A protein has these predicted regions:
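Juxtamembrane intracellular "pre-TM" segments in multi-pass secondary transporters
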Residues: 5-12, 195-223, 247
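Residue-level signature of mid-helix packing/kink "hotspots" within the transmembrane helices
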Residues: 35, 63-71, 121, 155-156, ...
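Extracytoplasmic gate region of multi-pass secondary transporters
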Residues: 37-38, 217-271, 331, 335
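Helix-breaking motifs and short loop linkers at transmembrane-helix boundaries and internal kinks
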Residues: 49, 81, 102-108, 119, ...
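Conserved MFS/SLC helix-loop-helix module at the cytosolic interface between two early adjacent transmembrane helices
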Residues: 68-104
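Structural signature of the two symmetry-related core transmembrane helices
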Residues: 84-98, 288-305
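Cytoplasmic helix-loop-helix junction between adjacent transmembrane helices
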Residues: 112-153
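Helix-loop-helix hairpin linking two adjacent transmembrane segments in secondary transporters
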Residues: 147-191
């Protein structure tokens, strides 16, 4: 597909919807695969004799390659057909997932997590390039929200199915089945992928160099704010199952249900908030409404501290769900903001740079949490740090990001 008029976009709506469905499915699989190790952690830790500190390093190792490959991925998306870049990355991360079920040692497990991170690094630059080129401003909120909902539905399904599957067959079967099953997505993508969408350019214009993007105040605001939001999310994604089982003493089955509920709550909030922003913009509001969503959503997510501060398990889980709802409001808009600011010309590079910075939190959050839990023997200060980082991100979006409007390049 190539950029077309508004009326033509309407005629292409079924094809665009098919692409969006496949993108949502891909990101769901993406997040199942990156979060599956945390689901298996209580069982894997015992079988492979891994300490809490080692587990923190293991959980963060995915982000070493995922984060540092973002700049390369952004360049690849602008240089080559992102559809095939996406297909290659998807194959790599699915293979890494399946092979994880065969490992016998700590070192090989880290190597496969590094391969998983490298494969998954292409996803978001591809998403942003396609959405910036083929969705109007008042359509991007819901499109991004549905993709973000996939990041929550994936872990929800993975936590529920994975917990039940591992309780019956063990953790190795879970990884092998997941890796092989994921590959079923590839034939559908090859058939329906938007042809040459990733190399869309405005006629007569050149993509700005990275140094030009880095000169813009808005880029650094989105980098920092997204880092803070990701810290909160990766803290939950990597440590919530372990926390529920070891500190709150839930069974594996109960952990699976509660973890899934938290992810579903976030997905629902994301979808509703994205749809409401689109409706408001279609009715005449500016894209600044997305900035308010990110700021207030992340600010309200600080109630996560109450999860570990209260003794009653029911009250604790209610606070967890409330924090996830608030985070969902944040998650509905942060990528739509980037796509508006960058436009089709800079979407690949800006997204790659932003995702690089944001996902450094995936290196920091699991490892720092593991160190805090090892040092203190409980999770209170780990939750406190996550809450403080979320509040910082809220302030960055509210006061550090200016007007949300397309940057002028060239």
């Amino acid at each position: 597909m190539t950029p077309v008029s508004t009326s033509a976009r309407a005629r292409l709506a079924p094809a665009v919807r098919a692409v969006l469905v496949l993108l949502v499915l891909s990101v769901s699989i993406n997040y199942i695969d990156r979060g599956n190790l945390s689901i298996a952690a209580p069982l894997l830790k015992e079988e492979l004799h891994i300490s809490p500190a080692q587990l923190g390093i293991l959980l963060s190792s995915f982000f070493w390659t995922y984060s540092f490959s973002q700049l390369l991925s952004g360049w690849l998306v602008d240089r080559f057909d992102a559809n095939w870049v996406m297909a290659a990355g998807f194959f790599l991360w699915s293979a890494a997932t399946g092979l994880t079920g065969l490992v016998q040692g700590f070192g090989v497990l880290i190597a496969l997590r590094l391969l998983l991170g490298f494969g998954e690094s292409v996803a978001y630059p591809c998403y942003s390039k396609i959405l910036a080129a083929h969705f109007l401003e008042h359509q991007r909120g819901l499109a991004n929200a549905l993709i973000d909902a996939g990041t929550k539905c994936g872990p929800a399904l993975g936590t529920l199915a994975g917990g039940l599957l591992m309780a019956r067959f063990g953790w190795r079967v879970f990884f092998v089945v997941l890796g092989l099953g994921s590959l079923l997505w590839l034939p559908f993508w090859i058939k329906w992928m938007p042809r040459a969408a990733a190399r869309t350019k405005t006629e007569g214009a050149e993509a700005p160099p990275m140094r030009e993007i880095l000169r813009r105040r808005a880029s650094w605001a989105t980098f920092a704010g997204h880092f803070c939001g990701n810290y909160f999310w990766y803290f939950l994604l990597t440590w919530l199952p372990f926390y529920l089982v070891r500190e709150r003493h839930f069974s594996m089955e109960a952990m699976a249900s509660l973890g899934s509920a938290a992810y579903v709550a976030t997905a629902l909030a994301t979808t509703v908030a994205g749809w409401m922003c689109d409706r408001s913009i279609a009715a005449g509001a500016t894209a600044n409404i997305r900035k308010r969503c990110t700021a207030w959503g992340l600010g309200l997510a600080t109630i996560i501290l109450g999860v570990t501060a209260v003794e009653d398990r029911t009250a604790s889980m209610v606070l967890l769900l409330a924090a996830c709802l608030a985070y969902g409001v944040f998650a509905s808009s942060h990528w739509a903001i980037t796509q508006t600011l960058a436009g089709p010309l800079a979407a690949g590079k800006w997204t790659g740079a932003q995702n690089f910075v944001a996902n450094l939190s995936g290196v920091v959050a699991p490892a720092l949490t593991g160190w805090i839990v090892s040092a203190t023997g409980h999770f209170f200060w780990a939750f406190a740090v996550s809450s403080g980082v979320a509040l910082t991100g809220s302030m960055v979006y509210l006061f550090g990001l200016g007007t949300v409007e397309p940057e002028k390049w060239g």
